[in-house]
């Protein structure tokens, strides 16, 4: 199937998002903890990606609405979060991605960010899908942990019928028994057969959901190995979250990449991506 390309317009020029183009980094922090920390993390990502020549989109959440515990930190909320996003975009001239959880959030969020993310737990919520589609924004669809990769076509169809075909599909692992996720690499390749760009969330694929009783655990020590495996498939992008002090991050610290490791980590990912995309395709079905 022909591979679709998404053009993300920025003041610095268009970013091409496609499975056969150089990979795009969707990176930042899990949740906005403070304005100063968000600015510092964004600055570091921008410096590293510019140095390495990697197209970049800043990611953070203004509200983590699906935390394990009612007492867990959720974020600053939409109003304050959008102010921080506006400042990041203005200061660093970088495109933005964030997630929405409710229909009423879609329009105001689309006025500020460039890509709206549909959370994995909500990916089959038709009213939310339609509201997101109607913004006309680029949509990043997280694959639910409970859904087979080939079933993503049904979510794509919902967006298409609501008038939006600017879709990115994101793999973030599949449930494997209790408190565990695994990544089906062949399933990710099946998602590519929809024709839409596929990105790999190598951070959340490291989760152990509910593994710490009232929050998710993770396998940060295996962040490099898992990401290299995903990049070897020849995909459109990589989704990662980093933190200067992962052990004290307010959400998903056990999965977060230490921020000081970002440059070395991305050097390896770029090397894998460049190598894989230099190969001529081989049709082994014949």
Curated annotation (Swiss-Prot):
It is found in: Cytoplasm. Pfam families: DAHP_synth_1. GO terms for cellular component: cytoplasm. InterPro entries: Aldolase_TIM, DAHP1/KDSA, KDO8P_synthase. It is an enzyme of class 2 (transferase). Disulfide bonds: none annotated. This is 2-dehydro-3-deoxyphosphooctonate aldolase. One of its GO terms (biological process) is keto-3-deoxy-D-manno-octulosonic acid biosynthetic process. Belongs to the KdsA family. It catalyses: D-arabinose 5-phosphate + phosphoenolpyruvate + H2O = 3-deoxy-alpha-D-manno-2-octulosonate-8-phosphate + phosphate. SUPFAM superfamilies: Aldolase. Its EC number is 2.5.1.55. Keywords: Cytoplasm, Lipopolysaccharide biosynthesis, Transferase. The gene is kdsA. It comes from the Bacteria. GO terms for molecular function: 3-deoxy-8-phosphooctulonate synthase activity. PANTHER family: PHOSPHO-2-DEHYDRO-3-DEOXYHEPTONATE ALDOLASE. Pathway: Carbohydrate biosynthesis; 3-deoxy-D-manno-octulosonate biosynthesis; 3-deoxy-D-manno-octulosonate from D-ribulose 5-phosphate: step 2/3; Bacterial outer membrane biogenesis; lipopolysaccharide biosynthesis.
């Amino acid at each position: 199937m022909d591979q679709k390309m998404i053009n993300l317009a920025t003041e610095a020029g268009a970013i091409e998002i496609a499975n056969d183009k150089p990979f795009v980094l969707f990176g930042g922090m899990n949740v906005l903890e403070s304005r100063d920390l968000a600015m510092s993390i964004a600055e570091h990502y921008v410096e590293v990606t510019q140095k390495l020549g990697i197209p970049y989109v800043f990611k953070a959440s203004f509200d983590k609405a699906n935390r394990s515990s009612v007492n867990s930190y959720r974020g600053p909320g939409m109003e304050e979060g959008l102010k921080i996003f506006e400042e990041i975009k203005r200061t660093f001239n970088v495109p933005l991605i964030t997630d929405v959880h409710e229909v009423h959030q879609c329009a105001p969020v689309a006025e500020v960010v460039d890509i709206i993310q549909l959370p994995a737990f909500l990916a089959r919520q038709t009213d939310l899908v339609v509201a997101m589609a109607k913004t006309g924004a680029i949509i990043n669809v997280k694959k639910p942990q409970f859904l087979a990769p080939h079933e993503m076509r049904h979510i794509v169809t919902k967006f298409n019928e609501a008038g939006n075909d600017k879709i990115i599909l994101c793999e973030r692992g599949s449930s494997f028994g209790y408190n565990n996720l695994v990544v089906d690499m062949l399933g990710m390749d099946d998602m590519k057969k929809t024709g839409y760009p596929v990105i790999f969330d190598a951070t959340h694929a490291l989760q152990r959901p509910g593994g710490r009783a009232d929050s998710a655990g993770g396998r940060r020590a295996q962040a490099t190995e898992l990401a290299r495996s995903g990049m070897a498939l020849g995909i459109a992008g990589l989704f990662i979250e980093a933190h200067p002090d992962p052990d004290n991050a307010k959400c998903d610290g056990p999965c977060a990449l230490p921020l000081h490791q970002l440059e070395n980590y991305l050097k390896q990912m770029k090397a894998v991506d460049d190598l894989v995309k230099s190969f001529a395709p081989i049709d082994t079905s014949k």
